[in-house]
Amino acid sequence: MYSGGIGVPAFVKWPKKITPKSTTNFVSSTLDYLPTIVDLLNISFPDDRPVDGVSLLPMIEGRETSRSQPLPFMHKGNAAWIERDLKYIYRDGDIVEIYNLHEDRFEENNLVSQYSEKAKEISNRIMQWNFSCKKSHGGADYSTDFTPVNQWRGIDKLQHK
């Protein structure tokens, strides 16, 4: 959930759209690939199934410098939620850490005491996102003959201390 595990560089080469050797601190994820491809091809999603990512095309074209929606991560019951400069980390269902990624790149200064109310709000949003992922994993967003390939391993309970 920390930057050493989820914060890695990405590379895009597109000579007619991107200035060579340009860089950005835009936060993105593989969740963004599908919406970006759909946007690049100028097509619409076939229905109203939930999509967790955002199109990176506005960033690529220089129209956006920061992410328009939060970026969620989940792994074996742990979660991270990046929204603007803040990163919220939920471990083991009850430990909350908050870091300002712009000012604290190495995630050493835990700001949880300064953002306790915001942490509760984000906790609720993570649980809503987790519920949406769980429903989708169970087939709720697909045809009735869908069978999940493995057991759901998301978050069953998050608490804020």
Predicted regions, residues:
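Short Gly/Pro-enriched turn/cap motifs at secondary-structure boundaries
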Residues: 1-3, 71-72, 78
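Short strand-connecting beta-turns/loops that link adjacent beta-strands
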Residues: 65, 93-94
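Long, internal low-complexity/basic segments
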Residues: 33, 101, 106-161
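Active-site beta-strand termini and strand-to-loop segments that position acidic
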Residues: 81-84, 90-91
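Substrate-binding rim/cap in mid-to-C-terminal beta-strand-loop elements of soluble/periplasmic
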Residues: 1-50, 54-66
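Hydrophobic, well-ordered secondary-structure elements that form the walls
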Residues: 9, 37, 56, 98-100, ...
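Short beta-strand-initiation
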Residues: 67, 75-76, 83
